[in-house]
Every structure is written in structure tokens, then in C-alpha cells.
Amino acid sequence: MDENESNQSLMTSSQYPKEAVRKRQNSARNSGGSDSSRFSRKSFKLDYRLEEDVTKSKKGKDGRFVNPWPTWKNHSIPHVLRWLIMEKDHSSVPSSKEELDKELPVLKPYFITNPEEAGVRETGLRVTWLGHATVMVEMDELIFLTDPIFSSRASPSQYMGPKRFRRSPCTISELPPIDAVLISHNHYDHLDYNSVIALNERFGNELRWFVPLGLLDWMQKCGCENVIELDWWEENCVPGHDKVTFVFTPSQHWCKRTLMDDNKVLWGSWSVLGPWNRFFFAGDTGYCPAFEEIGKRFGPFDLAAIPIGAYEPRRFMKYQHVDPEEAVRIHIDVQTKKSMAIHWGTFALANEHYLEPPVKLNEALERYGLNAEDFFVLKHGESRYLNTDDENF
């Protein structure tokens, strides 16, 4: 499939004082503490698109999707060229495999050594970071992937374009049985053609794909038949697991794969709402008011996967990619108890030093009165089990 992609870009909002952060955290904990409240939270058969105070997807006069918030700004071709030509690249990714193995080790995921342990069947939740925005989530008797990319390059061609400097921790053939895949948008580092083909070849119609509005035709051309295409605030489920609701929720970004298809496909985040756990996947996003809306409707979440990388230079990137401080604000806005860092340490997509995002994240957490366990960073291939049923969680 011959495809091409360019980059665009984005205003920081007001800061939260530490007291406000603690107040919102306490509110989130109090609203989801007891067993009875955890099970009573499953009441999602409302159509949130009918609510007056939710931000609905919007199209311009040309019929293409647009970001509906003042926090978005389109960049012209001269702005893109200035970034590509004039801005200094500080990423400094070493060519030495030994140095990379020391700084960013790639672990063998637990499910390769002990495949029989895959699948959390109790009330807990387990996540495994497979690099970039690819996360394997096990919760509420389901296993699903977010934005799977197992290829060496995030590009229409495996001979050019952004190349991984950290390999994927596993192959698709080594994955446990996957029930669903969540796609946030159609950029090459989030929607990888080769990974889609390989996942479909392995799992076929047993695998349900949840994709944004406008992507159904592309998925069907790849041979995928079990595809659910959703607008913001629409929901669906995996057959046989109707107690777990997948809601496509807003984010601030853009879409493009070819020269002429700008924003013909919607972009967004995902809220996964189960009887025991709630998971939020931010996808790729700039900071915007949508996250408070999501937290208001579906919070508190037990875990969120939030991007922390590809943010420099800010005057170009801020509209489409949050920096670590804005990632912490999303953590607060969606009312999540824990967050994990994604979208860093895999591809050099922007100009910050390749090891800077976790450092900036810890600095931001300290400013907001949070600790590293509230918003944690995993190694490639590393898993984290969260006992979400523990009253102290």
C-alpha cells in the first residue's frame, strides 16, 4: 500500500496548584472506593453525543474533520519546512547498541516465557508496554492492544522514514490471543499496515478492530472484516463481552496518510469501561478541554496511558503533542488513579533528547505534588500488575 505522511502541529493552559490536584484526586478516590460503587458504575447505555455539554466531532466546509477548540492551530507548509530545516535536533540517539541497551533495555515480555499466565481473570489489571503507543492491556477477562506497530519503520516504506532505535519486545506470533485492537488515528506510527496485516492473518475475524470514523474502508481493503468504526462518544463492545464498553472519546490531533487525504479520518482517544476496571488511552494529542469532559463522564479511571514524548520545539509541536507537564494535566483531568507513559523512547519523531521525557515527567510530577508511582514509566517489554480491587489502590 503506497502511502505518505507529513507533519503538522500546536497553547498551554492554566496550571493546577497542588491543593487543587489533591482535591480532585480525593474526589476521584471517594467516588470509586467501595465494591458496591465499583459495580454500580456500569451504566453507560446513554448516548453521550446527545448531551449538550460534550464536544462533538466537527467538519469544515470541505467536509474534512477539524479540531473544535481554540487550543488548536494549523501550521502552514513554511512552518513545517522551518521545523525540518532550521530547528536544531537535540535527540542525540546513540548508534551504539550497547549504550542503548544500557539506557533503554528491551525486556522479554512475561507471556513469551509463561504464555499460560496471560489474561487477568480477577478484578486486577495488567499492562505491558511494547514500545511507542503500543500497549497490551489485560482487564475484565479481555486482552487488547492499542495502536500496534511492530515494524522497524513508521513509514509507508520499510526502506525509508523514521526507524525504531529500540526493537519491538516481541513479534505478533508471540502475542497471546488478542480480543480487540484500538486505533487512535491513522498516522504511520499509530496505524502500521504490516502490523494490521499480520494481526489479521493470525487472528482473523476473532479479532475486533475499533477504529475512528472514516477508517472502515481502509481496514476492509486490508482484509479486516470485524471492524467497528465510531464517532466521538459512540460506544461498542467485543462479542461475548458486552459488560466491557469501548467508547471513542475526543483528542486534539489530525490525520494524514497520503498527499490529498488530510483529515478525512477522525482522531481520538479511547475509554474502556468494565465492571471491575476502567482504562483510558489518550492516543496522540495536544492539550485541550476534552480531557475534563472525559473525566467528568467516565472518571475515575484506574489506569491511563498518556503520551510524554515528541514535543520539541514547543512552538511547532504543542498543538498536536503534549509535553510531560501537559501529560500530567491530562492525568489530573481524566481523574485517573494511575498513569503509564507512552509515545517516547522508540522513534525519534521530534527534537528533544531521547532520554529527556521521563526526566521532565518526574519534574512535572513533583511540581504538582504527585509521585513517580502515580505516573510510572515502564521499560520496553515490561509489565505492571495493578490490584485495582485493593481499597488502598
From Swiss-Prot:
Binding site for Zn(2+) 2: 189-190, 284, 343
Transmembrane segments: none
Any GO MF annotation of the entry: N-acylphosphatidylethanolamine-specific phospholipase D activity
Alphabetical keyword list: Acetylation, Endosome, Golgi apparatus, Hydrolase, Lipid degradation, Lipid metabolism, Membrane, Metal-binding, Nucleus, Phospholipid degradation, Phospholipid metabolism, Zinc
Positions with biased composition (Polar residues): 1-16
Origin: domain of life: Eukaryota
Reaction equations catalysed: an N-acyl-1,2-diacyl-sn-glycero-3-phosphoethanolamine + H2O = an N-acylethanolamine + a 1,2-diacyl-sn-glycero-3-phosphate + H(+); N-butanoyl-1-hexadecanoyl-2-(9Z,12Z-octadecadienoyl)-sn-glycero-3-phosphoethanolamine + H2O = N-butanoyl ethanolamine + 1-hexadecanoyl-2-(9Z,12Z-octadecadienoyl)-sn-glycero-3-phosphate + H(+); N-hexanoyl-1-hexadecanoyl-2-(9Z,12Z-octadecadienoyl)-sn-glycero-3-phosphoethanolamine + H2O = N-hexanoyl ethanolamine + 1-hexadecanoyl-2-(9Z,12Z-octadecadienoyl)-sn-glycero-3-phosphate + H(+); N-octanoyl-1-hexadecanoyl-2-(9Z,12Z-octadecadienoyl)-sn-glycero-3-phosphoethanolamine + H2O = N-octanoyl ethanolamine + 1-hexadecanoyl-2-(9Z,12Z-octadecadienoyl)-sn-glycero-3-phosphate + H(+)
Pfam family, one: Lactamase_B_2
Regulation: Activated by divalent cations. Activated by bile acids.
Region called Disordered, residue ranges: 1-40
Residues that bear N-acetylmethionine: 1
Subcellular location(s) of the protein: Golgi apparatus membrane; Early endosome membrane; Nucleus envelope; Nucleus, Nucleoplasm
Textual note on the cofactor: Binds 2 zinc divalent cations per subunit.
Major location category of this protein: Golgi
Residues bound to an N-acyl-1,2-diacyl-sn-glycero-3-phosphoethanolamine: 188, 321
Cofactors named for this entry: Zn(2+)
Record: residues binding deoxycholate: 256, 260, 348
Tissue expression from the record: Widely expressed. Highest expression in brain, kidney and testis (at protein level). Expressed in adipose tissue (at protein level).
UniProt key word Lipoprotein: no
GO cellular component, one term: Golgi membrane
Enzyme Commission code(s) on record: 3.1.4.54
Gene Ontology BP annotations: host-mediated regulation of intestinal microbiota composition; N-acylethanolamine metabolic process; N-acylphosphatidylethanolamine metabolic process; phospholipid catabolic process; positive regulation of brown fat cell differentiation; positive regulation of inflammatory response; temperature homeostasis
Binding locations of Zn(2+) 1: 185, 187, 253, 284
Family the entry assigns: Belongs to the NAPE-PLD family.
Reported function: D-type phospholipase that hydrolyzes N-acyl-phosphatidylethanolamines (NAPEs) to produce bioactive N-acylethanolamines/fatty acid ethanolamides (NAEs/FAEs) and phosphatidic acid. Cleaves the terminal phosphodiester bond of diacyl- and alkenylacyl-NAPEs, primarily playing a role in the generation of long-chain saturated and monounsaturated NAEs in the brain. May control NAPE homeostasis in dopaminergic neuron membranes and regulate neuron survival, partly through RAC1 activation.
Name under which the protein is recorded: N-acyl-phosphatidylethanolamine-hydrolyzing phospholipase D
Protein's organism: Pongo abelii (Sumatran orangutan)
Gene: NAPEPLD
